[in-house]
């Protein structure tokens, strides 16, 4: 089996993985950002040395939990996406030198959106308003979008992330192994699950949501890809009000699919990424 292990932060994933009106108008704006008109970092601005020290002080046993997925042939991939890994000759190099060195290289072809573990940067999602595509902090797509990379809102602007992580086990709160595809997680669900765990959210935290949907990975890929449980708009807005840095889930979308409103396309992505960074 061809498997590629990619190094990922344990808290920036969307496989373990954000409501605007149907026709937004010019008065429906979310900019400038609270961090200034030129800000491209978004909610990561909530992270400072105090938050890092707070997170490090929580370590007691030094255990490491790997949340990323293996990139491998046959994994569930969002329709239209692609992933392949090949070894161009075995060995790719050598033998070389008197010591007869041999080696392998990998050739990877892929789209990173909805392929394995991923992180949605702020240039991923925007909203069209009166013919103008606007992203986080009101940046206009026509001024930074190119076929060879984004001139603004790249993930490199976010910077390193070391902070306190909170796992909200919604599946355990509801007494099931796995929430159903299309099951909406409400703000009350999150609050009640946190109360059950005796856990609270602090500004600058990362929130991980366990639905059990990840159990389907490489077991029933068709069901995994068919949709998923996830947060609805109420939960998304509540999380934003808690001033978190980011959220993640063991689903491919984080938000509920099919969505609460069949006429809306990924509104939770718009709420969290575009409006709240």
Can you say where each PLM-predicted feature lies in the sequence?
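Bacterial N-terminal signal peptides
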Residues: 7-18
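N-terminal secretory signal peptides that target proteins for export/translocation
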Residues: 1-4
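Active-/binding-site microenvironments in catalytic and ligand-binding cores
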Residues: 22-277
């Amino acid at each position: 089996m061809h498997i590629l292990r990619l190094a990922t932060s344990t808290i920036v994933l969307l496989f373990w993985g954000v409501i605007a009106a149907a026709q937004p108008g010019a008065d429906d704006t979310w900019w400038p950002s609270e961090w200034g008109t030129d800000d491209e970092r978004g909610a990561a601005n909530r992270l400072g040395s105090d938050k890092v020290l707070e997170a490090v002080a929580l370590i007691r046993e030094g255990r490491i939990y790997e949340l990323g997925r293996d990139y491998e042939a046959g994994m569930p991939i969002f329709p239209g996406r692609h992933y392949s890994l090949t070894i161009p000759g075995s060995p790719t190099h050598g033998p070389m030198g008197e010591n007869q060195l041999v080696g392998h290289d990998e050739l990877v072809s892929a789209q990173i959106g909805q392929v394995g573990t991923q992180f949605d940067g702020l240039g991923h999602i925007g909203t069209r308003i009166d013919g103008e595509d606007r992203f986080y902090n009101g940046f206009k797509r026509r001024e930074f979008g190119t076929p060879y990379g984004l001139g603004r809102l790249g993930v490199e602007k976010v910077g390193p992330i070391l902070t306190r992580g909170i796992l909200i086990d919604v599946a355990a709160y509801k007494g099931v192994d796995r929430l159903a595809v299309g099951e909406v997680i409400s703000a009350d669900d999150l609050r009640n699950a946190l109360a059950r765990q005796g856990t609270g959210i602090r500004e600058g935290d990362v929130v991980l949501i366990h639905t059990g949907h990840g159990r389907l990975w490489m077991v029933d890929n068709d069901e995994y890809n068919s949709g998923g449980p996830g947060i609805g708009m109420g939960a998304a807005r509540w999380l934003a009000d808690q001033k978190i840095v980011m959220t993640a889930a063991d689903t491919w979308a984080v938000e509920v699919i099919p969505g609460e409103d069949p006429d809306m396309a990924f509104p939770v992505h718009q709420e969290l990424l575009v409006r709240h960074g």
